[in-house]
Regions:
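Solvent-exposed beta-strand sheet faces enriched in polar/charged residues
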Residues: 6, 36, 45, 78-80
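Short, charge-patterned binding micro-sites
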Residues: 38-51
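C-terminal structural segments of small proteins and small subunits
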Residues: 53-81
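Short amphipathic alpha-helix segments
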Residues: 12-30
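Short glycine-/aliphatic-rich beta-strand segments at the starts of folded cytosolic domains
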Residues: 1-11, 40-43
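Non-catalytic surface loops within mature trypsin-like serine protease
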Residues: 9-11, 48, 81
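N-terminal glycine-rich anion-binding loops that anchor highly charged ligand groups
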Residues: 31-37
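Short, conserved charged micro-motifs
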Residues: 14-16, 50-57
Length: 81
């Protein structure tokens, strides 16, 4: 089983890298781009012995304890068989 974990800054936190990318896209005349937020992406391979509920709990614990700074970041994830 794999977990795909996406970590982003909270909407209330300024994202200077996202703003820089947005500015570059505008200068390059890309159309229809309203906002850019940058983040991190992790793929975590889990033991096949974990059921879906245990895998979900483990990923939530890992994301909260290791992958994010909960003051400024949030995460989402999806599990893949």
């Amino acid at each position: 089983m794999k977990a795909h974990v996406y970590v982003t800054l909270k909407q209330t936190v300024l994202d200077p890298q996202g703003q820089a990318i947005h500015g570059a896209l505008r200068k390059m005349q890309y159309q229809g781009i309203e906002d850019v937020r940058q983040g991190k992406y992790f793929v975590i391979r889990l033991s096949d012995s974990l059921d879906a509920a245990a895998a979900k709990a483990e990923i939530e614990r890992i994301a909260n304890d290791v992958l994010t700074n909960p003051v400024i970041e949030e995460f989402t994830f999806r599990l893949e068989e």
